[in-house]
Amino acid sequence: MADKVLLINPNQMKPPVAPLALDYLASALGESGFEVDLLDLCFFEHFVPEIERYFSRNSVFAIAITLRNTDDTCFATRDFFVPRLKEMTDCLRIYTSAPLILGGSGFSIMPESILHYCGLDLGIWGEGEYSMPLLVERIVAKEDYRDVPGLVYRSRKGFSRNPPKYLDLKNMPTPERNAVDNRRYFLEGGMGSIEAKRGCSKRCIYCTDPLAKGRRVRCRSPKGVVDEIGTLLKVGINHFHFCDSEFNLPPDHARDVCLEIIRRGFSAKIRWYAYCSPVPFSEELAVLFERAGCAGINFGV
């Protein structure tokens, strides 16, 4: 039997947002030979019974928990998620001794502080597709893992943080997108999520994306992006949100993705939304977006 890794989505915010990172991470772990389970707590009102139920039937070598956001980004409610994360990790400690590894965009904003608050020892800041399988391999083999890229770990001086490894997204295989129940998220949340690139070179004072995704823009192949759209279309998901920091940067890549959507005949089948920068943005690009099925843009300034 392959060594089993449990991925946990602790995000119970509504309307629900699919944990895209866990779909990508599940593919990477599967390609490395691990058996992967997903415990998605989004659709349960109470998480304790679900954790108890899972561990009454399963044992795992490691647990990876994604923190997508540290709060709900809503001025009216200002719901801070880290205390609830600690409640969940404290509960996990009752039922398993497997290493708990934190990660995700929210975690990457302040990894040492979150690990300290939760009383945990390990996390991955930045991208996890390379580092998480390597870390789990070292844990299973009982080998030293302190040089794993992007690792944040407890040390004698408090916490140590390794530089991350940023992936070559052009050669990234198309994720299977079958770990997460994307169909349910679509039905209850309204759209699916997809990523065409990572990184942002801008230095906006309000934005944390460069902390999690880096400052160098790395683009996926347009074919790979649209292949992934096709995968989700097969399960009935036809509204998408591009999670890129700025979908139109660089403009040539945005254009090529749109042209590939049109070439594949998807533009009449889908509607999509994206974050964009107002500069550079042309009328020509706007027309192409509309032809490719774009239904809305959020401009950040």
Where are these regions (language model features)?
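N-terminal [4Fe-4S]-dependent radical SAM core
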Residues: 5-6, 11, 77, 148, ...
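Glycine- and acidic-residue-enriched helix-capping/strand-helix junction motifs
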Residues: 12-22
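Glycine-rich beta-alpha loop elements in corrinoid/cobalamin-binding modules
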Residues: 4, 21, 25-28, 32-163
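Residue-level signal for short, function-critical loop segments
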Residues: 11-14, 42, 69, 246, ...
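Radical SAM [4Fe-4S] cluster-binding motif and immediate context
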Residues: 174-301
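Residue-level recognition of beta-strand->loop/alpha-helix junctions
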Residues: 9, 39-42, 211
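Conserved residues at the C-terminal ends of beta-strands
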Residues: 8, 66, 126, 154, ...
